[in-house]
């Protein structure tokens, strides 16, 4: 697999297979609401409730540029099947968050003890509709600043597809040229999907309407 970092849940219990500590009440933090104008969204997202947008399809994302030394995210995972994980890019380094499956709002630590400087975070949906995720905002240091987002690309593209378009088993590098392995979703990563790789090559914003095992025409 890719060797991505595996942060822990810091509120509401620890995900299976992950170590970690709970966030202490002594730390002063700033909560960033989902409708903060400094946040930037893209993808197939249900935004009927601006305080609780739902990320549905793979490669949907929310970005934030912030200062400070730590960042966490509050999510509610709506599990259908497989083990569910969210992806992120923090200052260009990719990681993933193992989600709990009880449908309740939880706060997950992404990073702490960062250099006290400018940081760029993109939280993205690694997996297809094996789950949906309600986003309730980020948590940063008390006194941290949010900075304006970078402009989106002028070019936009939309992909309709199945597993290769949403990145299912895209991290199963030991099975190249072989039959797909039996898995529980751990190899799925939309970042390495044909759809998102093509969008990055073309410098385009992507809307990825894809689901593993489902064709446009049956």
Question: Each predicted region: which residue ranges?
Answer:
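Structural recognition of the beta-strand scaffold that forms the well-ordered cores
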Residues: 158-159, 206-209
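N-terminal secretory targeting modules
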Residues: 3-9, 13, 18-190
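Short helix/loop capping segments that flank catalytic or ligand/cofactor-binding pockets
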Residues: 167-169, 206, 217
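Short linear, low-complexity motifs centered on an aromatic residue
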Residues: 88-92, 209, 216-217
